[in-house]
Regions:
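Contiguous beta-strand/loop segments that form the cofactor/metal-binding neighborhood of enzyme cores
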Residues: 195-274, 299-311
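Predominantly a Rossmann-like dinucleotide-binding segment in NAD(P)-dependent oxidoreductases
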Residues: 139-217, 337
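C-terminal helix-rich "cap/oligomerization" subdomain common to oxidoreductases
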Residues: 1, 29, 82-84, 304-344
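Beta-loop-alpha module in the N-terminal Rossmann-like domain of NAD(P)-dependent dehydrogenases
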Residues: 19, 62-125
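Hydrophobic residues in well-ordered beta-strands that form the structural core
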Residues: 108, 133-135, 240, 267
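N-terminal Rossmann-like dinucleotide-binding module
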Residues: 1-61
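Active-site loop of classical SDR/Rossmann-like NAD(P)-dependent oxidoreductases
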Residues: 288-300, 315
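Rossmann-fold dehydrogenase core element
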Residues: 121-138, 159-163
């Protein structure tokens, strides 16, 4: 039997805990170390909750792994092959830099970095490294979004005329999310998912026009954006809305509506993961999707990439970096109430 890849996870918030659960389901890897600056997360006496059912269901209680209060100590463990970085966004760059310097493969949670300047530095590090690195933009692997991308690219229902994405919830609370300088507000921490998928699916927009307002993070916590593609009759109308200013008890809304020449797709996250197709002359149809969440599929893809000997897909990584440039343009658009061109 071939040697298993050894994984170390830095950060045991909702995403780190979710990743921990997922690795236990994947052949060829095993988690041998975890790190968090909060002792109670390491010993299992506390854990973070996620937005979506199925996130962070397991835990560290009874887990036989090395535990570190400092993520840099985990990176210096010579037995570790993969470093999974799930710390605060403002810390992504320093941990990615350190892990690549130690020749570790790196999976880094979204967004790739706190700023586009930091993201560009990560791209340069990746270009020089023999290690693999992936930005964990989970919508690229989420079954309903995979289905949508294929429907657009293959014109399954004819030309795509319009796309609208929504991602809304109540304020998550806590010190990290209360500090825009760390998290980037809902604009960067939450809304980035939809901006990235638009970039991934349709390519870099030419410009954006955004409106929004500040919230409990001290930064932009509710945003509505129109993405402008200067391709006459070639690109759909594209918009998205992201917010964590909803009142307590609202829940989590993750949805999209895609209108095509010959059909309308409507997705709303729920227990059944239902994607509805509406067409003239037909009864609405529920489309059965592949079971599972994007988190699992992205991690499986990363592990497979390493085990197969493939190198980092720099195009996909660069796309994740440019997503941050789009988000920063959205921020400027809100502040100036103007259309802002994307500069990369």
């Amino acid at each position: 039997m071939s040697k298993k890849l050894k994984v170390g996870i830095i950060g045991l918030g909702s995403m780190g805990s979710t990743h921990l659960d997922i690795y236990s389901k994947i052949d060829g890897v095993e988690v041998i170390a975890i790190a968090d600056s909060i002792q109670s997360r390491l010993d299992g006496s506390s854990k973070a909750e996620g937005n979506i059912s199925g996130q962070a269901e397991g835990g560290v209680s009874g887990l036989s792994v090395k535990k570190y209060l400092n993520g840099m100590d985990l990176i210096n463990n010579s037995d570790i092959d993969i470093v999974d970085i799930c710390v605060g966004t403002d810390l992504h760059y320093i941990f990615v830099e350190a892990a690549l310097a130690r020749n570790k493969h790196v999976l880094v949670e979204k967004p790739l970095a706190r700023t586009y300047d930091e993201a560009k530095k990560i791209i340069k590090l990746a270009e020089k490294s023999s290690s693999n690195i992936m930005s964990a933009m989970c919508l690229r692997y989420w079954p309903a979004w995979v289905f949508l991308k294929e429907a657009i690219e293959k014109s399954i229902y004819g030309k795509c005329l319009s796309l609208n994405f929504r991602r809304q919830t109540s304020f998550p609370g806590g010190a990290f999310y209360s500090d825009d300088s760390q998290c980037g507000g809902a604009l960067l921490d939450l809304h980035v998912h939809d901006t990235d998928f638009i970039n991934f699916c349709l390519g870099l927009p030419d410009a954006v026009f955004s409106q929004g307002y500040n919230g409990p993070s001290g930064g932009i916590d509710h945003v509505v954006t129109n993405y402008i593609f200067n391709k006459t009759n070639a690109s759909p109308l594209v918009s998205s809305e992201g917010s964590w200013t909803m009142q307590e008890g609202y829940g989590f809304n993750m949805s999209y509506t895609a209108n095509f020449e010959n059909g309308t797709l409507s997705y709303l996250l729920d227990e059944e993961e239902t994607l509805k197709l509406c067409r003239y002359g037909y009864e609405p149809e529920n489309i059965k999707l592949k079971e599972g969440m994007g988190y699992e599929f992205e991690i499986r893809a990363f592990v497979d990439e390493i085990l197969s000997g493939n190198k980092t897909n720099l195009d996909l990584l660069s796309q994740a970096a440019k997503t941050i440039a789009i988000v920063e343009a959205e921020k400027i658009s809100i502040e100036t109430c103007s259309v802002v061109a994307i500069q990369t």
